[in-house]
Amino acid sequence: MPRVISDQEKIARFRAFWARSETDRPLIGATIATFPSVRAVRREAGLVAPDDLDIQENLKELDEEWQAWREVMGDAMFVANPLWAFPWHLAMAGCPIKRDADNLWGLPALDDWGQLGRLRFDPDNPWFRRQFEFTHALVRHAAGRYPVGAGQLMLGPVDMMMQVRGQERLALDLYDSPEMVRALGQRCVNLCAAAVHAIYAAVPTHLGGRAGTIRYFWAPGEFVETAEDISFMMSPALHRQFVVPIHRELSQRFPYTLVHLHSAQLHTVPTLLDVEEITAIQITPDFGEDLAPKIPLMAQILERKPLLVHGVMTVASGSEIIRNLPIRGLALLFRCDSPAEAAKVLDSFL
């Protein structure tokens, strides 16, 4: 059984990660591997309404995860997010949310550019009110046992554009209506940032900072994770034109911003490294992917920014990364199928 790391020791390692300080080893942790559960979504199929989300079931599930995993997470910080499987901000933007088996989808909501004015944050929006109710219940229920997060954007403003407008339409809009795409991006940033700030205002800090996002991470101040899955269909030039300004704008509103990438988006790394406002890069390897060919790119990232690798990885793969990369500003979080697997992984490193 691996040593249980205290929250105080975890905080010291998180601070070293963000500051890219010299340390004795990378930040190493283990997290649950499964995709978000939809147990708390009562409607089994079709369009979901705010009242279909079960607060008590969400609390029960989070407690179960905390009890099972809290001693086998290594440096990772358990954090309770309000039903983080749910695309809250898409719903606030007016996208109908559809359940299909265990998946939740946001359907397009912007058929005509004349509807763009509707896309804004409204504290009286029923979806925001429901998220706020979930968050308030989590804070009361956690009672200081574990932190409550508010920084999970699920998609973030970049990918939100694609969901709100629809993938095919947005692909054409990039060429036919570039100014409207920029206006859409700005509204997505405004909505996401305002909603997260409003939730943060209702959540207590944890050991002087904020815990949040699906990475089970902690930062010395407010932070968010955002994604850019949309960039798979963009050239570097289009990425610089439409995506970078959104990342920069969001990062100016939060002191700590983590940009999530898959292998299909790694061509954007050189551009992202030039965006000073982005704090750190996060890479999720595809299932079964050999990360060795990515080590030179990871080294480039670590020269400029902290790097978090979080996903399904073998111990051998993690060991190779540690052997070949500087440890300053490096974090590895292993997704594991069970607490027993997590314990074995951590025993290999800690």
Q: How would you label these PLM feature ranges?
A:
Residues 43, 50-57, 109-115, 125, ...:
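Intrinsic-disorder/low-complexity, polar/charged segments
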